[in-house]
């Protein structure tokens, strides 16, 4: 699981181009979007990117909040990995943010990490 400075996060005012840099730098295929209090308000994924490219939205002027998945699926630290895997399979997503009870991000992981850990 990625934590701390490895956690892919952008501010709600970030441009899409900035979110793409965060996705590329952190290598998880998504980034969380947080408000000014550090609360997760959405997730921007490579799937969101494909949709905005199809809609011909300008990556350098659009903000990530205009195109993100609002809310997004999350898990909590105490949830079992197999339960998180079931959530991912049910919703056909490949990565999850881990949040505390106030929806502040504390970690993130993807299917590859679960496979490497022997959960799959």
Located regions from the model:
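Tandem CBS (Bateman) regulatory domains
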Residues: 1-6, 40-94, 101-120
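Oxyanion-binding "anion nests"
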Residues: 1-38
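Short loop/turn microsegments at loop-to-beta-strand junctions
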Residues: 28-29, 93-95
